[in-house]
Amino acid sequence: MNKLIAGLEQQLAQLDAQSLRRRRRTTESPCAPRVQVDGRAMLAFCSNDYLGLAAHPRIIDALQQGASLYGAGSGASHLISGHSRAHAELEERLAEFVAPQIADARALYFCTGYMANIAILSALSGSGADLFSESLNHASLIDGARLSRANVQVYPHGDLDKLAILLAASTADNKMVVTDSVFSMDGDLAALPQLLALCEQHGAWLVVDDAHGFGVLGEHGRGVLEHFALRSPNLVYMGTLGKAAGVAGAFVAAHKSVIEWMVQRARPYIYTTAAPPAVAHALLTSLEIIGGAEGAERRAHLQTLIAQWRSALQLQRWRALASDTAIQPVVIGANDVAMKIAAALYEQNIWVPAIRPPTVPAGTARLRVTLSAAHTAEQVTQLVGALQQLEQQD
C-alpha cells in the first residue's frame, strides 16, 4: 500500500479507537425539528436554525425570486463584476440594522462566518499588533489570529483580570481583543460591557463574533450589542446569516472607515467569488422578519422553551451547563459514553450530536442540545424525558 495512504489510515484507526472519528448524516428534507435523516424520520435538536426561518415560505419565495432576477451565480469577485444590486441592498440594510449600536456604520457581506473572521483579524491587525484572544473562541477566530501575524496572547475563559493585566502591559499601537459573544459549545455569554470598557480604556479594538446571538438576542434581534446596549467606535461586529437568519453567509459591521479598509485589504473578501445574489435577495426578507413582529414572537417562544428546558431537566450525574441561550449542553464526560447516549437517543428517533475533543476539552464530551423557535413544548418534554431515562439506565 502507498506509504502516505497507509499513514492516514493508521491515524483514522486511532480516531476510531478513541471514539473521535466524525461521521456525516444525510438529511433529505428542509431544516426543521421534524426531518428525514438517512431515510428515517427524526426529531432534531442539533441545528442552529434558532428562529426556525430556514424553511420559512416567504424566504423560500424570495430566494426563488432572486434566482429569477439575478441567475444562479455571481460570476466574479465583488471587486470585479460580482457585486450585485442585491448585495449592495443587503449591506445597506445590515448597516441600518446595527446603526443604533455603531455610529457611521457600514456592513460587508461574506460567503461564510469563517471567512469574515479571518478577514477581520488579517486586515485590522498584523505584524506589530497585539491580539488578545479568549481561550474558548471559535476555530475561525483561532485560525484568523494565527494568520494575522500579530503577537497573539490567549487569556483564560472569562478572566477579565488577566486580560486587564495583558492590556496594561502592551506597548503596541494596534491592540485588539477578540471574543465570541455566545460560546458555541457552552452557551454562556461573554462579559461584553466589561470587555468594551477595557478596550476603550486601553485604546483597543473589540472584535465580537455574534454567530449565535444575531437574530436571537435583543429586543429587535440585533444581537448581543443590543442585548447589552453597547455603542462604541471601537466595536467590530461579525454576525452570521446562516443560523438565526436561516439562509447563508455572514457580515462584518463597523465604522465606515473600518469597512472601507477591509474592502481594500481583506483577502478573504477580495480573492473569492461573491455569493449568489439570490442568497442576498432572500436575506432581505429574513432581516425584515427578524426585525418585525413575527421575529419578536419567535424570540419570545424560544425563550419560553429555554425556560421550560432548564426547569424540567433534572440530572443526577450528568451536568447541564448554565446557559440562558438556545445552546443547552449536557456534559457526559467520556467520549465513548457520550457516543453511546447519542446513539441511544437516535434509536428513539431523537437526533442530538455528541461533541468530543478537540472541539471541547478532554473529559467533557457532551450532547449539544440546540433549541429553536420551531420546536414545541411537547417536543422539549419528549427530549427531557428521554435524557432522564437514559441517565438512570447508564
Curated annotation (Swiss-Prot):
Chain positions recorded as substrate binding sites: 22, 138, 359
Entries under Gene3D superfamilies matching the protein: Aspartate Aminotransferase, domain 1, Type I PLP-dependent aspartate aminotransferase-like (Major domain)
UniProt cofactor(s): pyridoxal 5'-phosphate
Catalyzed reaction equations: 6-carboxyhexanoyl-[ACP] + L-alanine + H(+) = (8S)-8-amino-7-oxononanoate + holo-[ACP] + CO2
GO molecular function: 8-amino-7-oxononanoate synthase activity; pyridoxal phosphate binding
Enzyme Commission code(s) on record: 2.3.1.47
Record InterPro entries: Aminotransferase_I/II_large (IPR004839), AON_synthase_class-II (IPR050087), AONS_Archaea/Proteobacteria (IPR004723), AONS_Proteobacteria (IPR022834), PyrdxlP-dep_Trfase (IPR015424), PyrdxlP-dep_Trfase_major (IPR015421), PyrdxlP-dep_Trfase_small (IPR015422)
Pathway terms, separated by semicolons: Cofactor biosynthesis; biotin biosynthesis
Transferase among keywords: yes
UniProt keyword annotations, A-Z: Biotin biosynthesis, Pyridoxal phosphate, Transferase
Binding site for pyridoxal 5'-phosphate: 113-114, 184, 212, 240
N6-(pyridoxal phosphate)lysine modified-residue sites: 243
EC top class named in words: transferase
Keyword RNA-binding: no
GO biological process terms, semicolon-separated: biotin biosynthetic process
Task of the protein: Catalyzes the decarboxylative condensation of pimeloyl-[acyl-carrier protein] and L-alanine to produce 8-amino-7-oxononanoate (AON), [acyl-carrier protein], and carbon dioxide.
Family: Belongs to the class-II pyridoxal-phosphate-dependent aminotransferase family. BioF subfamily.
Subunit record text: Homodimer.
Protein name: 8-amino-7-oxononanoate synthase
Upper classification of the organism: Bacteria, Pseudomonadati, Pseudomonadota, Betaproteobacteria, Burkholderiales
Gene: bioF
